[in-house]
Amino acid sequence: MANENHGSPREEASLLSHSPGTSNQSQPCSPKPIRLVQDLPEELVHAGWEKCWSRRENRPYYFNRFTNQSLWEMPVLGQHDVISDPLGLNATPLPQDSSLVETPPAENKPRKRQLSEEQPSGNGVKKPKIEIPVTPTGQSVPSSPSIPGTPTLKMWGTSPEDKQQAALLRPTEVYWDLDIQTNAVIKHRGPSEVLPPHPEVELLRSQLILKLRQHYRELCQQREGIEPPRESFNRWMLERKVVDKGSDPLLPSNCEPVVSPSMFREIMNDIPIRLSRIKFREEAKRLLFKYAEAARRLIESRSASPDSRKVVKWNVEDTFSWLRKDHSASKEDYMDRLEHLRRQCGPHVSAAAKDSVEGICSKIYHISLEYVKRIREKHLAILKENNISEEVEAPEVEPRLVYCYPVRLAVSAPPMPSVEMHMENNVVCIRYKGEMVKVSRNYFSKLWLLYRYSCIDDSAFERFLPRVWCLLRRYQMMFGVGLYEGTGLQGSLPVHVFEALHRLFGVSFECFASPLNCYFRQYCSAFPDTDGYFGSRGPCLDFAPLSGSFEANPPFCEELMDAMVSHFERLLESSPEPLSFIVFIPEWREPPTPALTRMEQSRFKRHQLILPAFEHEYRSGSQHICKKEEMHYKAVHNTAVLFLQNDPGFAKWAPTPERLQELSAAYRQSGRSHSSGSSSSSSSEAKDRDSGREQGPSREPHPT
């Protein structure tokens, strides 16, 4: 049921205008719920339950002042209390039907019908006995977004203007659907051992990451005479976390090998100079001259074999001679000559620079290792000050099947410091110790809803703003603070496509998302510590569903995409239940990425769809703060859509021609026209901006 004690969304203005200390006689008072004679058992009263009267429905209901949960029926004794038993370990197990999936009490209300529920499975596999995890149902989850009462808002310490408070939680544009329930089934798991986030720790981490980025820039400039390859530091962090076994959620500290293949490859591809795309003949001529000059300078300044020096110098002199003689060459002639020079000199130049580039990669890793130690010491000191132990006895986990639920942390969260918040037009600004992060009003409302759905240790929202600050700061530092930096690594599919995926293939879960760019309220993300409070199920590579339909749009990091394919194939191989992954990755062919090649050859591949470049869109990775006209951008490369399904998954969510046609039609609906009818994306300036955002990793360049 909707939160009866809070009223409906239509009543939000009157409810929010009534708060102690701000109401006056000229303001209308909100109707207070009538408290009935409390004839409840003493156990329920101690648990926070009381009996109230609904004027709208003209019947009694039961309200929990601790969790804000409302029920029509009297609460059942034996259900777990989220305060004393947040994980529900001592809860009385609910009776289960071996052939049916039960629905939790908080979800026994009308909700949207899902196509995946209406269609027969099409296979004879017996449905598993699936229990609903008690942890995420400790709080009532409304079937539609509703605005809470003033008392909750007042506990945030926000502006005293009640109308402004109401506006914060009333989105004007919505790019998500948090009503969709999950069909992802997992084995019940224990809480995560990562330490809970704290603004003081996050502030130190962000300062050290900025220093590490600066170290990387200086090493590239001083040792190789180049600027750091675009997004290479961001992809280094993504690639390192695939193999990292360290304690920090962001910085690597325990990796093998020490030299990152991703960082090494991208720096080497920019040596001796970065080859950019050219349009005109004179640009091609200058590029050829710069490459020859840089190759000669590098081979003379490094220790190289006499044969290597001879080959490079001879080819460089031959190129200079050709440039002096031929004044009628076309753009294609210059590019052919450049390609010939790269083939002749490239191996020798790379061999001469190899030790230096490995030194850069090793140096950055060891600096990161020292920074992680400092962050860890700071974090443990804060926990010790609050008498919180990092050593928590792991609870016993029952081996049962449950619907997926957000990550829970084993270590208790320490008290949070105060965080300031103010509004600038439609932007919410949150400040801690002079460091400010920003998020649009619409996405602030989204974070509030996700927090309300997922968080179980802060029913009064006293820690909401500090946790939002930590979340925004974490993603800001992960992808950099430059213009459009990192936005391509956080891009997501348009709303129309998500709607089609859910309607046609029963998709209800994103494998690579964040609280900021997710469409569903169930998703995997990079950071279980900051994101778990907002619905994250943890990192995708640690998430092991037994059944369900999933969308996967990974960051464009080759090592991460390759690890994703291995993970998906293991899951499809081991599960007898319907399991489906719809994967969206760039169609890079020169050379092809291992992930794309493996999926095309996989026995689980049921279909492959190619979306042409500049004929489909992504939503910006900075959608939570960017302008409306920049919300969507054209993809500058083809996108491959691959359907990986086991046999039961194929029988249930088969990519039939009719469904594929509808999915392609969804891509033809431009999100730009949806969000801004007056903006135009056909200009060359817009294409250049999109290209900057969508920049892939430095691969073998083809500057044509």
From Swiss-Prot:
InterPro entries: HSP70_C_sf, PCIF1-like, PCIF1_WW, WW_dom, WW_dom_sf. Residues 43-77 form the WW domain. SMART domains: WW. Residues 685-704 have a biased composition (Basic and acidic residues). This is mRNA (2'-O-methyladenosine-N(6)-)-methyltransferase. The modification Phosphothreonine is found at residue 152. The gene is PCIF1. It comes from Homo sapiens (Human). Belongs to the CAPAM family. The keyword Nucleus applies.
